[in-house]
Design a protein with these regions (language model features):
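Structured helix-beta-strand junction loops
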Residues: 101-102, 134
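N-terminal helical cap/lid subdomain that shapes the substrate entry/recognition surface
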Residues: 2-90, 101, 112, 203
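Asp-based, Mg2+/Mn2+-dependent phosphohydrolase catalytic module
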Residues: 1-3, 113, 119-208
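Alpha-helical elements of Rossmann-like donor-binding domains used by nucleotide-donor carbohydrate transfer enzymes
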Residues: 20-23, 44, 58, 62, ...
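A generic structural motif
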Residues: 102-104, 186
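Generic structural signal for small/hydrophobic residues in well-ordered secondary structure
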Residues: 8-11, 52, 99, 107, ...
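Short, flexible loop segments at the rims of nucleotide/cofactor-binding pockets, characterized by
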Residues: 82-86, 117, 146
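Structured, non-catalytic alpha/beta "coupling" segments that mediate domain-domain communication
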Residues: 104-108, 112-114
């Protein structure tokens, strides 16, 4: 019986727009930001940023180092990065509120402080309450200094939540993350970004 749901954020709760953010970085003199940006797991200094190994300031300095324009501002970098994320859709917000009445909801996300701050601010502007109110706990890679698909982050999250993996549904769009969670006994749902959110979640809960 499913008691807990662990949601990924980017690609599951929040739609991603990779091309839009790559175009924004190109306008800042960075032609190869795609070498670092991945919908599932970042690379290079971006991976270190999401793992909490470097600060937002250090991340921005790394961006400037690969740009043809060393004078780009913090705001320009943040805005370009945040274009990767669409707002959380209304039907997903409504379903999370509904699920919260029956299940213990958690966020388990490879994330960074720039994007996470942006999502929280945008969510509150759109819905009038804080994103964190939907969840028992929000597990973010940059705060935990560990990232999916490492088993460590799953085990740490389960321990903090006091949850049993066999009673926990994990929803993610990354096959590697799903494989890692399944190996630890989670009930899993490989999310398809081309299919409706509510339909996939309801099916996963029914099958679990």
């Amino acid at each position: 019986m499913i008691k807990n749901i662990f949601f990924d954020m980017g690609g599951v709760l929040v739609p991603l727009n990779k091309e839009r953010t790559l175009n924004a970085f190109r306008s800042l003199g960075i032609e190869k930001f795609a070498d670092y940006l991945n919908p599932y797991l970042q690379k290079g200094f971006f991976a270190r940023f999401e793992n909490g190994d470097i600060s937002a300031g250090q991340f921005r300095d790394c961006v400037r180092e690969i740009s043809s324009d060393n004078n780009i501002t913090d705001e320009q970098i943040d805005n370009a990065l945040n274009l990767f994320l669409d707002p959380l859709p209304a039907e997903r917000e409504a379903m999370l509120r509904e699920l919260k009445e029956e299940y213990r909801l958690y966020l388990l996300s490879n994330n960074n402080p720039i994007s996470f701050t942006h999502i929280n601010k945008e969510f509150e502007q759109n819905y009038g309450y804080q994103f964190k109110e939907l969840f028992i706990e929000m597990f973010c890679s940059y705060k935990m200094n560990m990232s999916k698909p490492s088993e460590k982050i799953f085990l740490k999250a389960l321990g903090i939540a006091g949850a049993n993996s066999g009673e926990t549904l994990f929803i993610d769009d990354s096959p590697a993350n799903i494989e890692a969670a399944a190996g630890l006994g989670f009930i899993t749902c490989l999310y398809d970004v081309e299919k409706p959110f509510t339909e996939q979640v309801r099916r996963a809960l029914a099958n679990g």
